Amino acid sequence: MKLALSLFLLSGSLAQYSNPGACSGDCWGHDPGFYQRVSDGRYYRFSTGGGIQIHASDNLEGPWEAVGEALPGGSVVDHAGSTNLWAPDIHYEASTNLYYMYYSVSTLGSRDSVIGVATSPNLQPNWTDHGALFRSQAGGNYNAIDANWASIGGSPILTFGSYWNGIHQLPLAGPLSLADGATPTQIAYNSSGNHAIEAGFVFYRRGWYYLTFSSGRAGSYDTNPPATGEEYRIVVCRSASGTGDFVDKSGRSCLTDNGGTTILASHGNVYGPGGQGVFEDRTRGWVLYYHYANPDIGLSTGQYQFGWNVLQWADGWPSV
């Protein structure tokens, strides 16, 4: 398998994707959340596993160090997955001077899932857990994991979803509660295969709301590798409203036509990039961050690497 993967990655290098930016120190990462602290610009990244693993550095390139867990011992949510939390998403509210972390509580292959929320004044370990914000049911059409907060048209919106009926949005009343009568609205879907689309992330730039998401299979690369090209890749769509009508660069709907323009896929020593987000760095501009597997290091989730690239822009579309 390793020889076949190496040949595939070599051929994929012709796609002209840039290699990840430099990373030193502890560069492990999985489904990273990311924030540059408001007070001093220090970088923090948060990863799937246990009570959410936290790494910190004064520089984006590192050296990165593990500093602890956001919720040691897990979440207060009553669920089988409460001690192995997934997919953290971080944002800051100036009105409360607090950082908010949305996290996922679930088990593989299940729609019995919960999005929880926790707060911190400084991004350091030992956050205050506020428990469940939203829950999906085992027989439902959507999966309450992979949450992302965004201000859309001045209102707080939670984007979430994985597989099944794809990516959805929910209006919030505030960072700790849903809006009255809130129901999920579907914004992106992949009708093919097992509907492998997840990790939606919305950001705003110059009149457009951009939706990035991960398409393809996320893991088991070491024990049950997917067919060539079916591993994770990062795609993008955009919308003027931010709450629907997302299309890709060719104009295909990302809800009804399986749209999505690939901005990063396997190449070189980068395999299965995904679990992504975007932030505006104080000096570099817009930066895409994600995890990936480096075959020279290993393909298991415990060997995933943190990756980042400065986004380039042409005609209102990002690339790396």
From Swiss-Prot:
GO terms for molecular function: arabinan endo-1,5-alpha-L-arabinosidase activity. Residues 1-15 form the signal peptide. It holds the Pfam family Glyco_hydro_43. It comes from Emericella nidulans (strain FGSC A4 / ATCC 38163 / CBS 112.46 / NRRL 194 / M139) (Aspergillus nidulans). Its EC number is 3.2.1.99. GO terms for biological process: arabinan catabolic process; pectin catabolic process; xylan catabolic process. The active site is at residues 31, 198. The gene is abnC. Glycans are attached at residues 126, 190. This is Arabinan endo-1,5-alpha-L-arabinosidase C. Belongs to the glycosyl hydrolase 43 family. It is an enzyme of class 3 (hydrolase). GO terms for cellular component: extracellular region. InterPro entries: GH43_arabinanases, Glyco_hydro_43, Glyco_hydro_43_endo_a_Ara-ase, Glyco_hydro_beta-prop_sf.
